[in-house]
């Protein structure tokens, strides 16, 4: 049993609780506030980036189904 103790300690090491450092979160307002126009551009860009390709694929599903097999 004495020879298994170091191996057992190695296996239990990942199971021990790790001390997670505290995040440095600032409660101050932004130095340069984002204007409504910038927010609108950003939201539009995100919308187009994520939903644009999905919309393209969904609108062309019938074409993909009819594509001749090679």
From Swiss-Prot:
State where it is primarily located: mitochondrion
Q: Pathway listed for it?
A: Energy metabolism; oxidative phosphorylation
Localization per record: Mitochondrion inner membrane
Q: Which residues cross the membrane?
A: 36-59
Keywords for this protein: Membrane, Mitochondrion, Mitochondrion inner membrane, Transit peptide, Transmembrane, Transmembrane helix
Q: Indicate whether Transmembrane appears among the record's keywords.
A: yes
Q: Which residues lie on this side of the membrane: Mitochondrial intermembrane?
A: 60-70
GO BP field: mitochondrial electron transport, cytochrome c to oxygen
Q: Does the keyword Transmembrane apply?
A: yes
Q: Which residues form a coiled coil?
A: none
Q: Please report the record's description of how this protein sits within the membrane.
A: Single-pass membrane protein
Q: Where is the transit peptide?
A: 1-24
Gene3D superfamilies named among the record's database cross-references: Cytochrome c oxidase, subunit 8
GO terms for cellular component? mitochondrial inner membrane; respiratory chain complex IV
Mitochondrial matrix compartment ranges equal: 25-35
Q: Which InterPro entries match?
A: Cyt_c_oxidase_su8, Cyt_c_oxidase_su8_sf
Task performed by this protein:
Component of the cytochrome c oxidase, the last enzyme in the mitochondrial electron transport chain which drives oxidative phosphorylation. The respiratory chain contains 3 multisubunit complexes succinate dehydrogenase (complex II, CII), ubiquinol-cytochrome c oxidoreductase (cytochrome b-c1 complex, complex III, CIII) and cytochrome c oxidase (complex IV, CIV), that cooperate to transfer electrons derived from NADH and succinate to molecular oxygen, creating an electrochemical gradient over the inner membrane that drives transmembrane transport and the ATP synthase.
The family classification in the record reads: Belongs to the cytochrome c oxidase VIII family.
The record's note on quaternary structure and interaction partners says: Component of the cytochrome c oxidase (complex IV, CIV), a multisubunit enzyme composed of 14 subunits. The complex is composed of a catalytic core of 3 subunits MT-CO1, MT-CO2 and MT-CO3, encoded in the mitochondrial DNA, and 11 supernumerary subunits COX4I, COX5A, COX5B, COX6A, COX6B, COX6C, COX7A, COX7B, COX7C, COX8 and NDUFA4, which are encoded in the nuclear genome.
- What is the protein named? Cytochrome c oxidase subunit 8B, mitochondrial
The lineage is: Eukaryota, Metazoa, Chordata, Craniata, Vertebrata
Q: Which gene encodes it?
A: COX8B
